[in-house]
């Protein structure tokens, strides 16, 4: 193993000796399906795909995204993204920042779901100087697998969330 800025790193998911609950994938888009396959072989059940270069780029990217989702479904992996900022949970028992946001926001009772990573970043930056915080922050990106309906259901039942902010560019399944 090697270390990057003091953190152990591995050349492949298959080389990681520990159990992995959630993977944050930030590799070039063409490498994502292979990485998701490795996650499946390791039994990982959740992944945040931050990488861009999927359906937002056209037909070839859309096929790459569909292939990635098919591999994830084969292994029962829930995917957030691709092309997203990531996810944040401010619960002190969890304290997860699986994103490339600059820092973790203050804890609060507002959940924020945004399809746009740029808007999520702007809202998080604005919130730093204000008197409110977030319970959860989710950037959906392309919504290739997990979508706003999945998160809305979870957040509706989340005791740490009293308000849900939502920014969407489209609805995954309006009838749901």
Regions found by a protein language model. Give the residues of each.
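Catalytic-core regions of core metabolic enzymes
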Residues: 1-176
């Amino acid at each position: 193993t090697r270390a990057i800025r003091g953190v152990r790193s591995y050349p492949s998911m298959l080389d990681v000796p520990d159990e992995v609950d959630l993977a944050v994938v930030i590799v070039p888009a063409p490498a994502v399906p292979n990485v998701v396959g490795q996650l499946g072989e390791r039994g990982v059940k959740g992944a945040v795909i931050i990488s861009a270069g999927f359906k937002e780029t056209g037909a070839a990217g859309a096929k790459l995204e569909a292939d990635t989702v098919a591999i994830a479904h084969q292994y029962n992996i829930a995917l957030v993204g691709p092309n997203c900022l990531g996810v944040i949970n401010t619960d002190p028992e969890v304290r997860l920042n699986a994103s490339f946001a600059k820092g973790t926001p203050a804890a609060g009772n507002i959940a924020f779901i945004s399809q746009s990573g740029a808007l999520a970043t702007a809202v998080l930056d604005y919130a730093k100087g204000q008197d409110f915080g977030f319970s959860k922050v989710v950037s959906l990106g392309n919504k290739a697998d997990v979508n706003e309906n999945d998160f809305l259901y979870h957040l509706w039942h989340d005791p740490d969330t009293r308000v849900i902010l939502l920014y969407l560019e489209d609805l995954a399944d309006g009838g749901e």
